[in-house]
From Swiss-Prot:
Belongs to the MurCDEF family. MurE subfamily. InterPro entries: Mur-like_cat_sf, Mur_ligase_C, Mur_ligase_C_dom_sf, Mur_ligase_cen, Mur_ligase_N, MurE/MurF_N, UDP-N-AcMur-Glu-dNH2Pim_ligase. The modification N6-carboxylysine is found at residue 262. This is UDP-N-acetylmuramoyl-L-alanyl-D-glutamate--2,6-diaminopimelate ligase. The gene is murE. Its main location: cytoplasm. It catalyses: UDP-N-acetyl-alpha-D-muramoyl-L-alanyl-D-glutamate + meso-2,6-diaminopimelate + ATP = UDP-N-acetyl-alpha-D-muramoyl-L-alanyl-gamma-D-glutamyl-meso-2,6-diaminopimelate + ADP + phosphate + H(+). GO terms for biological process: cell division; cell wall organization; peptidoglycan biosynthetic process; regulation of cell shape. SUPFAM superfamilies: MurD-like peptide ligases, catalytic domain (SSF53623), MurD-like peptide ligases, peptide-binding domain (SSF53244), MurE/MurF N-terminal domain (SSF63418).
């Protein structure tokens, strides 16, 4: 096996483990439960031999499912899966002590348990592959009682989910949202460690949303979620595709594999296929996805023939933009959003097409769309300084290019502070350096989330890409992210733009085996306030 293949295999295992995942957080209050024997029959799991196994299986009722022993509630089935450093079966004792009534594991897990479990143990050769459907059964197939909208793509998922949720709420719908920034149920926020939660957590969340009166859920669907079965057991009313560019090649062996993971939400032969597809066709991948899907509703903000199009795009004095959305009937709708950038016109068009599909007209959605701001997405930090200061989540080449292109203007200077994540696709680093040096006047290369990699080596790769440009940009290396932000702020003159890119809404910096509190928005605000005090 090549080093690249070994790295991808290791990353898949690490992602599957999710040792950093947050607690479950949201569960239904009332679950009827399912007999363990029926669940075993459903997924084709065998009963492992051991004390008290066969006699009690028929009498066991499962009322919850979890992957984490510390999240077990009485009545749960504990799914003990393979991890990057340990097998979940090692935590079976803790799970049982917390009330687990059964265990689902693989043959390696059975060997680890070695007949020591005082509850029935179901064994399956690939338990992760059946976990989503099993959890959906335990929680009463909640997605069948909701309108579930799944949004996938490299960039724009978070913004589009926020736009859709805003449109739903403006139309009087009770909406749920699941994504990178967190989970929202009827306006109440919960944190999230994953773009798309693990299958048992997702099904529990959906069931809890049903209990709370939610009628429509909009969620981000990552390629990891599709490849690892996190959305198995979920019925999607609408699947939407935003775009595709280089990302996650530490997990996917190729861009083709990355595309195919996304395509499982649209392919007519896929068990995950959404009933209706909405596809932005402004890149090659979008056009290929529209061809793959059956009767896709197409969207274009780039003057391509599509069901939904944008015309008369113009910036507003408040820093947003307005445009006319042309619907499939050829009717124009005046739309205003507080988000800059042509890519956000595309995101808004995707949202409008989704909303129309689920019965919300543009006119109903407009009051919500025009007020929405997305945390950490071109989020403006204003402390009275004479220049524009922004924080954005752009952490991949095309996202960085899009944001810098939006902000660049011949009459003002542009500074960008960014790094690259460790233990992630290293092939993104040099291209990001090149893009920054091509489009910005000041490039400050700093640390992002180095994780377990040497941060100096990461910065070196970015700097090598920037050096290839050989232009007029000033390129500096400042390892400490706080100092890097302060440097860019001190450099800025009235009318300039300072962008802090890569971490967006995140509130911690991962490196050296720990997470330290760090929020780009807080640090940028502090730097601006210090600047004003000195003035």
């Amino acid at each position: 096996m090549s080093s690249l293949a070994r790295g991808i295999s290791r990353r898949r295992t690490e992602v599957a483990t999710q040792v950093e995942a947050a607690p479950t957080g949201l569960r239904p209050n009332a679950v009827v439960g399912v007999r363990l024997a029926a669940l075993a029959d459903q997924v084709g799991a065998a009963l492992a031999e051991g004390p008290a196994q066969r006699a009690v299986t028929e009498d066991r009722t499962v009322t919850g499912v979890t992957l984490r022993a510390q999240d077990v509630s009485p009545g749960d089935l504990f799914a003990a899966l393979t991890g990057s450093t340990t097998h979940g079966a090692r935590h079976v004792g803790d799970a049982i002590a917390r009330g687990a009534v059964a265990v689902l594991t693989d043959p390696a897990g059975v060997a680890e348990i070695a007949g020591r479990a005082a509850v029935p143990v179901l064994v399956h050769p690939a338990p992760r592959g059946v976990l989503g459907g099993l959890a959906a059964t335990v929680y009463g197939h909640p997605s069948e009682r909701l309108t579930v909208i799944g949004i996938t793509g490299t960039s724009g998922k978070t913004t589009t989910t926020y736009l859709v949720e805003a449109g739903l709420r403006a139309a009087g719908r009770v909406a749920g949202l699941i994504g990178t920034i967190g989970i929202r149920v009827g306006g109440a926020d919960l944190p999230s460690a994953l773009t798309t939660p693990e299958a048992p957590t997702l099904q529990a969340m959906l069931a809890a949303m049903v209990e709370r009166g939610v009628d429509t859920v909009v969620m981000e669907v990552s390629s990891h979620a599709l490849a690892l079965g996190r959305v198995d057991g979920t019925r999607f009313a609408v699947g939407a595709f935003t775009n595709l560019s280089r990302d996650h090649l530490d997990f996917h062996p190729s861009m083709a594999d990355y595309f195919e993971a996304k395509a499982s939400l649209f392919d007519p032969d896929s068990a995950l296929r959404a009933r209706t597809a909405v596809v932005c066709i402004d890149d090659d991948a979008g056009r290929a996805m529209a061809a793959r899907a059956a009767d896709a509703i197409t969207v274009s903000a780039a003057d391509r023939p599509a069901h939904w199009r944008a015309t008369d795009v113009a910036p507003t004095d408040a820093g947003g933009q307005q445009f006319t959305a042309i619907d499939p009937a050829g009717v124009g709708h005046h739309i205003g959003i507080r988000l800059p950038g042509r890519y956000n016109v595309a995101n808004c068009l995707v949202a409008l097409a989704i909303l129309d599909t689920v019965g919300v007209s543009p006119e109903q959605a407009v009051p919500g769309l025009r007020e929405i701001r997305v945390p950490g997405r071109l989020e403006q930090i204003d402390r009275g300084q004479g220049f524009l200061a922004l924080v954005d989540y752009a952490h991949k080449p095309e996202a960085l290019r899009s944001v810098l292109t939006t902000l660049a203007h011949p009459d003002r200077r542009l500074a960008v502070v960014f790094g690259a994540g460790g233990d992630r696709d290293p092939g993104k680093r040099a291209p990001m350096g090149r893009i920054a040096a091509q489009l910005a006047d000041l490039v400050v290369v700093t640390d992002d989330n180095p994780r377990d990699e040497d941060p100096t080596a990461i910065r070196r790769e970015i700097l090598a890409g920037a050096a290839e440009v050989g232009g007029d940009a000033q390129v500096v290396e400042i390892a400490d992210r706080r100092d890097a932000i302060r440097h860019a702020v001190a450099w800025a003159r009235p009318g300039d733009v300072v962008l802090i890119a890569g971490k967006g809404h995140e509130t911690g910096q991962r490196g050296g085996g720990r997470v330290r509190p760090f929020d780009d928005r807080v640090e940028l605000a502090a730097a601006l306030e210090a600047l004003e005090r000195r003035a």
